[in-house]
Design a protein with these regions (language model features):
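Catalytic-domain carbohydrate-binding cleft regions of carbohydrate-active enzymes
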Residues: 1-135
Length: 135
C-alpha cells in the first residue's frame, strides 16, 4: 500500500479510466504538478469509491457541500503516458478547428476506456457523471 488512501483504495477497486488496453490506468499530468489518474464516474464501483471517500472526509471535516468545479479529465499532456496510439479513433478524418487539431489536447486519448466505452464517446459525460455520483 501507498501513502494516499484515495489512490490506494481506487487502485484496489479498479475505478480509474484506463488506457486503450482496458486494464492499465491512464496517467496524465494535472494540478498540483505531477502524475494523475482519473476516476471513471461511469463505473458503479467508482460511485462506491467516491461515496466512501466523501464519507471519510466528512468524518474529518463536517462539510455541508462539495464544489466539484473543474470536473473534467484535464491533462497537461497531449493525452496521457506514453502518448496516444496512431489509430482512427485518436486521429479521426475530421477534427474540429481546435488549438492543435488533436482531440487529446489537454485531455485523455480518445481511445482510453471507461466503463461505458471509449473516452471518445464519454468525454462530455465526465462532469455529469461526477455530479450524479456526488448528488
Amino acid at each position: 500500500p501507498g501513502t494516499y488512501r484515495p489512490y490506494d483504495l481506487g487502485e484496489e477497486m479498479g475505478v480509474w479510466v484506463n488506457n486503450s488496453d482496458g486494464t492499465t490506468p491512464a496517467v496524465g499530468k494535472a494540478w498540483p504538478p505531477g502524475d494523475s489518474v482519473f476516476p471513471d464516474y461511469t463505473n458503479p464501483r467508482t460511485v462506491e469509491w467516491w461515496t466512501q471517500m466523501c464519507l471519510e472526509f466528512k468524518d474529518v471535516l463536517d462539510y455541508d457541500g462539495i464544489w466539484i468545479d473543474m470536473n473534467e479529465p484535464s491533462s497537461f499532456l497531449r493525452g496521457q503516458y506514453p502518448g496516444c496510439a496512431v489509430n482512427d479513433i485518436n486521429n479521426p478524418p475530421y477534427v474540429p478547428s481546435i488549438s492543435d487539431r488533436s482531440l487529446a489536447q489537454k485531455t485523455l486519448c480518445p481511445d482510453s476506456k471507461t466503463y461505458l466505452g471509449a473516452h471518445y464517446n464519454t468525454h462530455s459525460l465526465f462532469g455529469w457523471s461526477q455530479t450524479a455520483a456526488t448528488f
